[in-house]
């Protein structure tokens, strides 16, 4: 089961979140049938949103949009504060690797664009923030958002490793933040440790990558685990929700679906589930609108 572990240095100088998101990203790949680069880009976005959602309180809903002008198009993710996330990528078929190393490429195919967050607190006044994409690698873009919009300098690591068949092998990440009151000496020690950390891909390849991430972040510094919470890919779409959407259409449009298509099929963008509405279903909707 996927999870996020929240922890804090015993000194109170900084905190860290580490995530195992392997099942989340694997299910997203399965539902959207994404190729290598698209899988990694979508996976990183889902992990970023899992981190962002874990930082919220109450029943907030968090939307992350990574909008580029190159091959991927846009990537949309929606998460809640209960550990659920869903998402999709506009172009599922990007499959580009470095010839020499086989490394999956992401940044060069995101292009110029924006990292957009919408936090809905349920009050009717969602908070929206937009920052430019810095590298298109998503992790760096997320870190820039946290620094610029939330005024919280953060170290971020996100990645998805694929097997020889380009299926998700492991996915996860971390966030480290200095807390108010940290001394200059503590901040310097924290920065030095982060500079010396192995690459996120190396840590994820460890046998137990969650423990490997925590060890790399804290080193010999004492820390305590605050909580461990489950994470999952879960879509909240339903036939009733799409039926309500059809009810907003004019009668003429519903009648055209009956006359021309003998029904309607609606596909959820976030999870690919297909909902069929036959002629009788549409006629019932027309009668309900009468």
Swiss-Prot record:
It is found in: Cytoplasm. Keywords: Chaperone, Cytoplasm, Disulfide bond, Redox-active center, Zinc. Under oxidizing conditions two disulfide bonds are formed involving the reactive cysteines. Under reducing conditions zinc is bound to the reactive cysteines and the protein is inactive. GO terms for biological process: protein refolding. SUPFAM superfamilies: Hsp33 domain (SSF64397), HSP33 redox switch-like (SSF118352). Belongs to the HSP33 family. This is 33 kDa chaperonin. It comes from Streptococcus pyogenes serotype M18 (strain MGAS8232).
């Amino acid at each position: 089961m996927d999870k996020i572990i929240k922890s804090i240095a015993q000194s109170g100088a900084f905190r860290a979140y580490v995530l195992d998101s392997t099942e989340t990203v694997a299910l997203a790949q399965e539902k959207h049938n994404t190729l290598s680069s698209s899988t990694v880009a979508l996976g990183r976005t889902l992990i970023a949103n899992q981190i962002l959602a874990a930082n919220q309180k109450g029943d907030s809903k968090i939307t992350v949009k990574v909008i580029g002008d190159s091959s991927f198009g846009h990537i949309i993710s929606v998460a809640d504060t209960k550990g659920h996330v869903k998402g999709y990528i506009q172009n599922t078929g990007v499959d580009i690797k470095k010839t020499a190393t086989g490394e999956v490429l992401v940044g060069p195919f995101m292009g110029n664009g924006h990292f957009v967050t919408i936090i809905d607190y349920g009050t009717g006044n969602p908070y929206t923030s937009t920052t430019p994409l810095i590298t298109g690698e998503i992790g760096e873009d997320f870190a820039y958002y946290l620094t610029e919009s939330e005024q919280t300098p953060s170290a971020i690591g996100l990645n998805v490793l694929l097997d020889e068949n380009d299926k998700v092998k492991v996915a996860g990440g971390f966030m480290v933040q200095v807390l108010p009151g940290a001394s200059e000496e503590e901040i310097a020690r924290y920065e030095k440790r982060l500079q010396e950390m192995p690459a996120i891909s190396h840590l994820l390849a460890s046998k137990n990558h969650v423990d490997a991430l925590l060890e790399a972040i804290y080193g010999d510094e004492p820390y305590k685990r605050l909580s461990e919470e489950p994470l999952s890919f879960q879509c909240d779409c339903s036939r009733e929700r799409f039926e309500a959407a059809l009810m907003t259409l004019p009668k003429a449009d519903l009648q055209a679906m009956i006359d021309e298509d003998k029904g309607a099929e609606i596909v959820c963008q976030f999870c690919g589930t297909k909902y069929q509405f036959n002629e009788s279903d549409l006629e019932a909707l027309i009668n309900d609108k009468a």
